[in-house]
């Protein structure tokens, strides 16, 4: 399956800012049910960012997508902004960070990872 197949297989993409409690606090079960509903209705394009809930949206989405084959969805994220000052404060054990911040590497976003992905991108069918 090529990227175009994945992008057109669902009705919409799924933006995960609300999963990071952007508008209101969302329990983990509700976040998972929301992503599951999108998946069950054919959505396969997911957009997230480290800034959404100080990483909470990425963590919640990552837990859900880990249950599915990596070739069955497209994951988009943003890079370049870290919240290092918040990680190093006394608040790191507060409600915001109880979900595993500092992040664990699940997908390789390092320079080395990006360089490795370049040949992979060239092999993907865009037709």
Task: Give residue spans per PLM region.
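N-terminal binding-site loop/beta-alpha segment at the start of enzyme catalytic domains
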Residues: 1-86, 92
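Glycine/proline-rich, positively charged
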Residues: 23, 91-127
